[in-house]
């Protein structure tokens, strides 16, 4: 779990996301509050509930990107999922409790990685012994083994093929048994594929011929897992999920009930009703054991351009007490997105062309022109936010990208005139840009 201060979290998000200070502050405070709660002692710790967040903002303004970057920062079980994937309990499809089951799998993966790091040295020694057995046989003399061990450590045998037996992970090698309309689903807490895999003896490994270099990673993972207590790992992962789990529910505006619509609404209001106990705090049965959701942080986000936040069920609104409004992007924001972020679009484009030996030289007025065209098209056609920049930029460098292989060693200047020449006629014609930009 991260111990960054709210200021450090915001500055980390600033490296990749332009503007949206309010949203960054809200998620930074929420993340820090997880750590603060851990410092409390006694019954008060159980009483402190997370303050769930609802992020409201137009498409392409950075809601999902904040979630992606937060996942890397959190150092805790984090799941990003779309609310539109679920249907009401009792209908074909995934029910919302699958969110918690997926989060537990993420938590187990994170905890397993930590445990593997702790036993890495022992696992590497065991993997090396297995590779030596495959190379020279278990009955070889100590001198022969030591000779091969030296070559192995000097990477001289990396290309040599060996035959090793690897245990399949989970139900690998077994056909997938799925309930129609519910991919990867569980019947209650039991995963059908896992159950049938065990019943049909799917745990036996098959010998495989692979190179020594390729054998290391799976063997180290397998030997690490032998040294790790699975039951203790699962208990620790569930505890981590219950205390520090974060769920990012995207596209929540798409499950608002539409006015004037009648009939079954199995993936809208029904899903909202099912989310209520999950967000408030309930116990979900998973194949690893029961999981309490009382202290899982939920961050919901939506564009709300067709519906309004007030269209959500009042009970659900009450369970998302912190509202953050993200602002539409301006010309200045677009210029920052093109140049200022750590992996900006201009840096990406220049780096891609350099692989062909072509140097792109974007002038200041070219960047200004790109930003203005994107804003104009967003205003006249459909506002898709920062995603519009990718469309405009691709159109500008389309010709260079196509002929780059023949222009190795060239430096191509891109100025405002070049940008206007490529896109302005389309940007000016609203009907054309509706289909092309």
Swiss-Prot record:
Residues involved in ATP binding: 18, 60-65, 250, 315, 387
Listed Pfam families: AAA (PF00004), AAA_2 (PF07724)
SUPFAM superfamilies hit by this protein: P-loop containing nucleoside triphosphate hydrolases
Keyword line: ATP-binding, Chaperone, Cytoplasm, Nucleotide-binding, Stress response
Gene Ontology terms describing biological process: protein unfolding; proteolysis involved in protein catabolic process
Functional summary from the UniProt entry: ATPase subunit of a proteasome-like degradation complex; this subunit has chaperone activity. The binding of ATP and its subsequent hydrolysis by HslU are essential for unfolding of protein substrates subsequently hydrolyzed by HslV. HslU recognizes the N-terminal part of its protein substrates and unfolds these before they are guided to HslV for hydrolysis.
Name recorded for this polypeptide: ATP-dependent protease ATPase subunit HslU
Source organism (scientific name): Methylorubrum extorquens (strain CM4 / NCIMB 13688) (Methylobacterium extorquens)
């Amino acid at each position: 779990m991260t111990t960054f201060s709210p200021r450090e979290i915001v500055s980390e998000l600033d490296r990749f996301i332009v503007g949206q200070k309010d949203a960054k502050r809200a998620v930074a405070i929420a993340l820090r509050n997880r750590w603060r709660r851990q410092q409390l002692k006694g019954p008060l710790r159980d009483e402190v509930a997370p303050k769930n967040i609802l992020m409201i903002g137009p498409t392409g303004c950075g809601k999902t990107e904040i979630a992606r970057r937060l996942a890397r920062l959190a150092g805790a079980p984090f799941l990003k999922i779309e609310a539109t994937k679920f249907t009401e309990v009792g209908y074909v499809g995934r029910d919302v409790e699958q969110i918690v089951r997926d989060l537990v799998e993420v938590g187990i993966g994170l905890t397993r990685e930590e445990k593997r790091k702790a036993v890495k040295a022992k696992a590497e020694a065991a993997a090396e012994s297995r590779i030596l057995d495959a190379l020279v046989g278990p009955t070889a003399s100590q001198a022969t083994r030591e000779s091969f061990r030296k070559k192995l450590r000097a990477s001289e045998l990396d290309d040599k093929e060996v035959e090793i037996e690897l245990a399949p992970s989970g139900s690998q090698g077994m056909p997938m048994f799925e309930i129609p309309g519910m991919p990867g689903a569980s019947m209650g807490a039991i995963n059908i594929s896992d159950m049938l895999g065990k019943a049909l003896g799917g745990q036996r490994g098959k010998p495989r011929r692979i190179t020594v270099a390729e054998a290391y990673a799976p063997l180290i993972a397998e030997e690490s897992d032998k040294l790790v207590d699975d039951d203790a790992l699962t208990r620790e992962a569930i505890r981590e999920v219950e205390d520090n789990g974060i769920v990012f529910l995207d596209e929540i505006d798409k499950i608002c009930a539409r006015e004037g619509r009648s009939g079954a609404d199995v993936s809208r209001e029904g899903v909202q009703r099912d989310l209520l106990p999950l967000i408030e705090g309930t116990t979900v049965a998973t194949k690893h054991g029961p999981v309490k959701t009382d202290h899982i942080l939920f961050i919901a986000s939506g564009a709300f351009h067709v519906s309004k936040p007030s269209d959500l069920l009042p009970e659900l609104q009450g369970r998302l007490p912190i509202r953050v409004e993200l602002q539409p992007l301006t010309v200045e924001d677009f210029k920052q997105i093109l140049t200022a972020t750590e992996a900006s679009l201009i840096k990406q484009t220049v780096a891609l062309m350099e692989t062909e030996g072509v140097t792109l030289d974007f002038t200041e007025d070219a960047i200004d022109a790109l930003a203005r065209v994107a804003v104009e098209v967003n205003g006249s056609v459909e506002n898709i936010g920062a995603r519009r920049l990718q469309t405009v930029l691709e159109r500008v460098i389309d010709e260079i990208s196509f002929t780059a292989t023949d222009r190795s060693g060239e430096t191509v200047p891109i100025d405002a005139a070049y940008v206007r020449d490529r896109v302005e006629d389309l940007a000016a014609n609203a009907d054309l840009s509706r289909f092309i930009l």
